A protein has these predicted regions:
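BRCT (BRCA1 C-terminal) domain core and associated BRCT-interaction motifs
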Residues: 63-75, 86-87
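A basic, amphipathic helix-loop patch mediating RNA/tRNA/ribosome contacts
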Residues: 1-11
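Short linker/helix segments within small regulatory modules
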Residues: 11, 141-153
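Short metal-coordination and nucleic-acid-contact micro-motifs, chiefly zinc-binding Cys/His arrays
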Residues: 117-121, 150-153
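Extended interfacial segments that mediate partner engagement and assembly in macromolecular machines
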Residues: 25, 29-58, 166-184
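Short cysteine-rich clusters marking metal-coordination/redox-active sites
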Residues: 124-127, 157-160
Length: 185
């Protein structure tokens, strides 16, 4: 928003005769540094999808609003929510309202708005830790017999130890990655 030819915040008080220009926020919306997000308790599915895509995404299903603001500020994360009241908190460093009720609509909104770099299959969907490739021998004691027989390629979270492989569920996940990649192009 411009008033009198200079950028002003929405709270700016106009003087008589001021001319106001309002421009849309550019897309993708510029952020300081690589996008890092913190999602509120109502966006758990979106959080898992962002992690699947390799986007640095913090999420806790039991964190109250003041704690979310503190974490977002301390870690310089964009707080994503559908709670407009949360976004109005003065102490919040940076936040964004996520549009849509379906997780696919929410994901598309976020990808089109912020265009984070996608690195699919590199983050743990449970804790956001970084995945690393591991040998079957390293994780064999953790696997059920059918999994050991059927799969040879594995990844493991360096933070929580969760083991990943391209199992029967991977078709659905690959479709999410395919759609997200198309939306980000």
């Amino acid at each position: 928003m411009l008033a009198g030819g200079r950028g002003v915040p929405p709270s700016h008080l106009l003087a008589p005769g001021d001319e106001v220009e309002v421009h849309p926020v550019p897309r993708p919306q510029p952020l300081p540094g690589e996008p890092r997000f913190l999602l509120d308790v109502h966006l758990g599915t979106l959080a898992r999808r962002l992690r699947l895509l390799g986007v640095d995404t913090a999420y806790h299903n039991d964190m109250d609003d003041p704690a979310l603001v503190v974490q977002a500020n301390e870690e310089r994360r964009v707080l994503l929510t559908q709670d407009r009241g949360l976004l109005r908190r003065r102490a919040l460093w940076l936040g964004a309202y996520i549009r849509g009720s379906a997780p696919s609509d929410q994901l598309r909104d976020l990808l089109e708005r912020f265009a984070p770099p996608l690195r699919p299959w590199t983050r743990c969907t449970a804790c956001n830790g970084v995945l690393r490739p591991v040998t079957k021998d390293e994780v064999e004691p953790l696997l059920e017999a059918g999994t050991r027989r059927s799969y040879d390629a594995y990844g493991r979270c360096g933070s929580c130890g969760q083991v990943y492989w391209h199992g029967a569920h991977s078709g659905h996940l690959e479709e999410i990655v395919r759609m997200a990649t198309a939306w980000s192009a």
